[in-house]
Amino acid sequence: MRRSIESVIESWATKDASRPLLIRGARRVGKTYAAEEIGRRIAGDAFIKLDFQTDLELIAPLFDCPTDDVDTIVARISDYKRTPIRKETAFILFDEVQLCERALNSLRFFSGSGWRICATGSQLGVATRKRKLPFPSGVRQETMHPMSFEEFLWALDEGQMADAVRTHAGTLETYAAHQAALSLFHR
């Protein structure tokens, strides 16, 4: 399933990963799916995922060190995953990072470190009100929304219709497949 955010993640990962990428959005909109898809495609076996939702008790201690010591954090992640992690190839995903305040805080120290760190978070606004540490600066933030009509058309393999709807949306021209598009919209 193709999502618009994927091009943002891919561009960040291949051209400008100097700052960690934090993908915000409501629960269950596909943040993890999109980040994993791109991470696995770009990094292959060097893709590392830390899932704070399911493994919080195991992962949180990895951040029980100064949060500005990113090399120690990565070394601990490497030990936890039992795999070497190389800066040049790794794509590290912190999934549902808001559940671990120290992990969320560490993001700002990964900025400029050379590590490619992507994080996802839902309910970040709620989580940040309860925080003892400041919200991380130096992090690129993107918001992911529920599936758009264009993404819905892509999922149905209706790419040509998606392009035509986008083209005609800003004009007063009639669209030959308007009824078909409307029918899909109401589906």
Placement of each model-derived feature along the sequence:
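Sensor-1/coupling segment of RecA-like P-loop NTPase cores
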Residues: S111-K132
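Conserved lysine of the Walker
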Residues: K31
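Hydrophobic positions on the alpha1 helix immediately C-terminal to the Walker A/P-loop
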Residues: A34, I38
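Hydrophobic anchor at the beta1->P-loop junction of P-loop NTPases
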Residues: I23
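Conserved P-loop NTPase "ATPase switch" module shared by AAA+ and STAND
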Residues: P84-A103
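Interdomain motor-coupling "hinge/lid" segment immediately C-terminal to the ATP-binding subdomain
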Residues: T128-R187
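Short glycine-rich substrate-engagement loop in P-loop NTPases that contacts/grips substrate
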Residues: T54-K87
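Pre-Walker A adenine-sensing motif
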Residues: M1-D16
